């Protein structure tokens, strides 16, 4: 089973490579639209980009590891049989790699931002809490900003250097 940071870094890197190779339109469509119409930049949703990243992550994970008891979920708000919460607030992480219905295999939580909306303070706080809270204890947390190109992608791992 995958549980080493290096393995996660490799799969994340390869997933980003595939995303930028096959789905660059999702990331750069706003720029193209701005050239065609006289309007503010109209970008695709972060969710659509994260969905494709998750698709590639799962594909690569299943290819490399034969134990398929872990799940990749996008915008997942469940905690066992309840809603995922931090204090009183309902939370919905962008991407989690875990075993559904259990909290013992919470491997990775990622929050994403896009180059046109890159404010990360709230996301970093959410990751910190999901990694530290006894109820969740994700082994790893990361914040990823999708850049205009693959080379511009910014990945920060928890604990964050401030």
Report the location of each language-model feature.
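Active-site metal-binding core of divalent-cation-utilizing nuclease and nuclease-like domains
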Residues: 67-103
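A general structural signal for alpha-helical elements within enzymatic catalytic domains
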Residues: 58-63, 132
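Charged, often low-complexity linker/regulatory segments
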Residues: 1-57
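Mg2+/Mn2+-dependent nuclease catalytic core
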Residues: 115-133
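Conserved catalytic cores of phosphodiester-cleaving nucleases, focusing on short active-site segments
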Residues: 94-97, 106-116, 127
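Catalytic phosphate/metal-binding cores of nucleic-acid and nucleotide-processing enzymes, i.e., regions
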Residues: 55, 63, 90
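Feature marks short, surface-exposed loop/turn motifs that line or immediately flank catalytic pockets
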Residues: 18, 22, 80, 116
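Domain-level recognition of nuclease-like catalytic cores that cleave nucleotide substrates
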Residues: 132-133, 140-162
């Amino acid at each position: 089973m995958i549980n080493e940071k290096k393995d996660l870094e490799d799969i994340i890197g390869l997933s980003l490579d595939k995303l930028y190779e096959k789905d660059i339109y999702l990331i750069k469509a706003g720029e193209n639209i701005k050239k065609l119409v006289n309007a503010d930049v109209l970008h695709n949703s972060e969710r659509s980009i994260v969905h494709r990243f998750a698709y590639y992550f799962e594909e690569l994970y299943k290819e490399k590891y034969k134990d398929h008891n872990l799940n990749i979920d996008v915008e997942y708000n469940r905690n066992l049989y309840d809603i995922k919460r931090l204090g009183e607030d309902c939370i919905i992480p962008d991407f989690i790699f875990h075993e559904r219905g259990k909290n013992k295999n919470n491997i990775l939580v990622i929050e994403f931002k896009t180059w046109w909306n890159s404010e990360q303070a709230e996301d970093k706080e959410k990751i910190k809490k999901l990694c530290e809270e006894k109820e969740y204890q994700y082994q790893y947390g990361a914040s990823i900003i999708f850049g205009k190109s693959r080379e511009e992608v910014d990945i920060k791992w928890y604990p964050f250097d401030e």
